[in-house]
Amino acid sequence: MYKFLVFSSVLVLFFAQASCQRFIQPTFRPPPTQRPITRTVRQAGQEPLWLYQGDNVPRAPSTADHPILPSKIDDVQLDPNRRYVRSVTNPENNEASIEHSHHTVDIGLDQPIESHRNTRDLRFLYPRGKLPVPTLPPFNPKPIYIDMGNRYRRHASEDQEELRQYNEHFLIPRDIFQE
């Protein structure tokens, strides 16, 4: 019976590893949520609170200054019987001219390239985005450990000493060239 229990436990471990099952342990707890900050309303009275007091910059009238004026002032004076789609000054940008144009650019190829308005969205071709990368041992690379102790030098003299030792051992002495 003891051999059967040992064999079955080893078999369960191999099966869990082979079937790519990872047992998720609840080790992460999200931080506690903070209560919303409540602020009191400033007592403004009947006066609007401007950011800069005392400057002589003319400001647009507001409804607080003039309660008779409407909340939305129409400075452009557009004709209410005419529909303006994109721009008042450029009649080529209205919706009627956009519907009748083809939106293709011919650059001399076999087929013209469509502009960005008629192009297809690539999210429909690849709805999931990138394929998932396997993370189990036959697929993921083993980590390479690099000694980071000598990466940053504290003093420039250490670099000069190392360069001097390198020149002594691996380079040709300058005395040979002077002869």
Swiss-Prot record:
Q: Which residues form the propeptide?
A: 17-120, 153-179
Q: Where in the cell is it found?
A: Secreted
Main location per the UniProt record: secreted
Cellular component GO terms, alphabetically? extracellular region
In Swiss-Prot or TrEMBL terms, this protein is called: Lebocin-3
State the gene name recorded for this protein. Answer: LEB3
Write the lineage as a comma-separated list.
Eukaryota, Metazoa, Ecdysozoa, Arthropoda, Hexapoda
Which residues are noted as glycosylation sites? 135
Q: Does the keyword Zinc apply?
A: no
Q: Does the keyword Repeat apply?
A: no
